[in-house]
Amino acid sequence: MPKTDLVSIPSSCTLCPRRCGADRAAGRTGFCGAGSTLKAARAALHYWEEPCISGTKGSGTVFFSGCTLKCCFCQNYPISAEGLGREITVEHLAEIFLSLQSQGAHNINLVTPGQWQPWIIAALDIARAKGLRLPIVCNTGGYETVESVEAWRGYIDIWLADLKYVSSALSAELSSAPDYFAQAKPAIEAMMAQAGHPAFDAEGILQKGVILRHLALPGHIDDSFAVLDQMAAWNDADPGCFIPSVMSQYTPFYKAAEHGIGRRITTYEYRRVVNYAMDKGLAQGYMQQKSSAKEEYTPSFDLTGV
């Protein structure tokens, strides 16, 4: 990995499970769309995460450009798939973190940060030296390597991770990742081992731990049941080792209609998923209301804060 003053830029990138080998040091982009220069699309207080993340003051959220998944229904597709964002320096990212802290954020929330891990770690080092003291959230689609999870040790306090699928066929069709579950399962286990059981401050704001999300998809609740089976197995083995969050907010963005999911989930479908979660002993987490499936909950990627 050739080094700049602050960052070791991959010359054969293996940061995500695709291990595409892109020479990012030479400015080439990988499968994720990321090259040699850090890129972000929004940095602002965000109020629509789980209550223990957003609290009353908001989560200091930075949306990074690019993504290691290619979800056909992605609500953030302008930044994840179409490259929207502004190139920034590591030093500027550190100042963004400090600005969000000064605005009263409960935490720093890194959205799809995996493809920029070395850059973000360098920025966190700078920001910490200048007084950053907030918990750091890794907001990830779950498609990670165990090695990348380990590389975040000492930097990430809270994992806000998806478990999207169990079915290889479904993850191939909807996210171009037939190995999604094979990669996500050990990665999530590494997250739980690293973070430990959830811990909260006096205001009920999460300080460390794992929130494990699942977004129920229309027409695919059988795979939701399989996901919940895996969540239940983890919870049975170590009760309270994570906070489950079952979401109904699916909205058919981007290319969803081309893949047979061009509608919202029905109340009947979501009730079946929630009831299954309850039956599996996952009642200690969050269950979204159907009213959350609204486009206005999607942030505007207008380069605010970057």
Residue ranges and their predicted role:
Residues A81-L84, L110, V137, G285-Q288:
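Residue-level detector of family-conserved "landmark" positions at structurally sensitive sites
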Residues M1-T68, C72, N76-A81, F301-L303:
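N-terminal [4Fe-4S]-dependent radical SAM core
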Residues M1-T29, H197-V306:
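Auxiliary Fe-S-binding modules of radical SAM enzymes
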Residues E95-H259:
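Conserved AdoMet/S-adenosylmethionine-binding subsite of the radical SAM
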Residues A40-T61, E95-P113, G285-M287:
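Short Fe-S-cluster ligation motifs
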Residues S65, L69-Q103:
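Glycine-rich active-site/cofactor-binding loop and its immediate structural neighborhood
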Residues T89, Q115-W116, S292-A293:
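Positions that flank functional sites
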Residues R86-V90, A177, F181, R263-T267:
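Flexible, glycine- and charge-enriched loops at secondary-structure boundaries
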